[in-house]
Swiss-Prot record:
UniProt record similarity statement: Belongs to the adenylyl cyclase class-3 family.
Highest classification ranks of the organism: Bacteria, Pseudomonadati, Myxococcota, Myxococcia, Myxococcales
Record keywords: ATP-binding, cAMP biosynthesis, Cell membrane, Lyase, Magnesium, Membrane, Metal-binding, Nucleotide-binding, Transmembrane, Transmembrane helix
Stretches the record annotates as Ion channel: 1-223
TM regions (residue ranges): 26-46, 57-77, 88-108, 114-134, 163-183
Domain Guanylate cyclase: 230-363
Protein name: Adenylate cyclase 1
Subcellular location: Cell membrane
EC number: 4.6.1.1
Free-text comment on the cofactor: Binds 1 Mg(2+) ion per subunit.
Binding site for Mg(2+): 235, 279
GO cellular component terms, semicolon-separated: plasma membrane
CDD domains membership: CHD (cd07302)
Length: 424
């Protein structure tokens, strides 16, 4: 059974091919109109202006050919559904029109064989152009019609059977080349579509830099694994009571503004966005690409999120809107990571396990401890002396038999970073 990602790829590829067929149909019709316009102008000049009867005989049929070409272009613009079948116009319009014009030219030409040979070149060009339809059936139909028209002209020109068969072989070779070109175009479109979908899927979870590295490593489909990571949960304080005072569209606007700012901070520190849980944010560091500094990045991200919230609140205050407060919990430990969900409907690359649960519990403790950020001992030990730490009283959390040691971090000042002593 094809999974959801596979169906999405196939559906997107089908839409991409249909869109490309539409663009190619319009471009091909414009090329035909310009080409027929140029030849019609030449025919009018030599036939009507210069009075050359051998050119004047072409003017009425070529004017009719030009009119049909122009009407075809107009129809493609007005009726988009016709673009999918635009390749048939090569077989139903161009091939018969060229045969008609050359049929008229045969009695007037001193070299009927030359007329038939020139027509062979025109038909070969049409076959190659039919590859732009991105449909092999169209190319084969154009080739068959061109072969019939070319053989008929050569018979009228009294050219030998061997030459007629050779002409068919030449047109067949052109068809083979056109089909190969068509295959290459479809392959390139498929590859480009798959890469774009892969980039879009990765971009949902990972920062642009991480997504690019994963794509270079061809790791869009990550395998399940147990890995040490740093989990971060962020939650808006008193969001329920705040949302009850707002209209639905205001709630959505608030969350979009808040999440937009916070996700940029997360990605700036190389974090992986796991999910939005109402007004909460779940992020982890150190996966899917290993990062020995995941604890430090997680703590710095938490500090920068609190700082970014000050910018958000300044904008909200200027608009007369209430300020927001957040609580952030950070914990480091082993977690199971992989694509979890329905293989036929929806899969999400996520982290599960006790580490995730404890990180969420630590975030909840920020409400009772009245601090914006709390981190576990494991995170504090791995992040090291990059930050200053204040140890809080251990806290009891559901699911743990022993109280959990928690710390609140803050950035060092420039003087402290230079090595000056500072109080913890």
């Amino acid at each position: 059974m094809m999974d959801a990602a596979g169906r999405t790829t196939q559906e997107t590829l089908a839409r991409t091919l249909e869109s490309e067929q539409g663009h190619n149909a319009l471009n091909l019709s414009w090329v035909r109109l310009l080409a027929t316009s140029a030849v019609l102008i030449v025919s009018l000049y030599f036939g009507r202006v210069r009075g050359m009867t051998d050119w004047d005989v072409y003017t009425p049929p070529f004017a009719a050919y030009w009119s049909v070409t122009a009407l075809t272009l107009v129809a493609l613009y007005r009726f988009e559904r016709l673009r999918r079948w635009a390749g048939l116009s090569l077989a139903l319009v161009d091939v018969p029109a060229i045969y008609w014009l050359q049929h008229i030219a045969l009695p007037l030409s001193p070299s009927p064989g030359g007329v038939a040979g020139f027509t062979l070149g025109l038909y070969a060009t049409l076959i190659l152009l039919s590859a732009l339809s991105l449909r092999r059936t169209m190319t084969l139909v154009v080739t068959a019609c061109a072969a019939v028209g070319e053989v008929a002209l050569q018979r009228e020109a009294h050219i030998s059977l061997g030459a007629q068969l050779t002409a068919v072989v030449v047109l067949g070779a052109c068809a083979a080349g056109a089909c190969h070109l068509l295959l290459r175009i479809r392959t390139l479109l498929t590859t480009a579509t798959q890469q774009e979908l892969k980039r879009a899927r990765l971009g949902r979870y990972f920062s642009p830099a991480v997504a690019e590295r994963l794509q270079d490593l061809d790791r869009s489909e990550t395998s399940p694994e147990l890995r040490e990571v740093t989990l971060l949960f962020a939650d808006i304080r008193d969001f329920t009571s705040l949302s009850e005072r707002l209209r639905p569209e205001q709630v959505v606007t608030l969350l979009n503004e808040y999440y937009g700012r916070m996700v940029e901070v997360v990605f700036r520190h190389g974090g992986t966005l796991d999910k939005f849980i109402g007004d909460a944010l779940m992020v982890y560091f150190g996966a899917p690409i290993a990062d020995p500094a995941h604890a430090r990045r997680g703590v710095q991200c938490a500090l920068d999120m609190v700082q970014e919230l000050e910018t958000v609140n300044a904008l909200r205050s200027a608009r007369g809107e209430p300020c927001l407060r957040i609580g952030v919990g950070v914990h480091t430990g082993p977690a199971v990571l992989g694509n979890i969900g329905s293989a036929t409907r929806r899969l999400e690359y996520t982290a599960i396990g006790d580490t995730v649960n404890l990180a969420s519990r630590i975030e909840s403790l920020t409400k009772t401890r009245d601090v914006p950020i709390l981190a576990s001992r494991a995170t504090r030990e791995q992040a090291g002396d990059t930050f200053l730490w204040n140890e809080m009283a251990p806290a009891s959390v559901p699911g743990k038999s022993q109280p959990v040691a928690i710390f609140t971090p803050r950035n060092r000042t420039p003087a402290q970073q230079a090595g000056a002593p500072a109080a913890a």
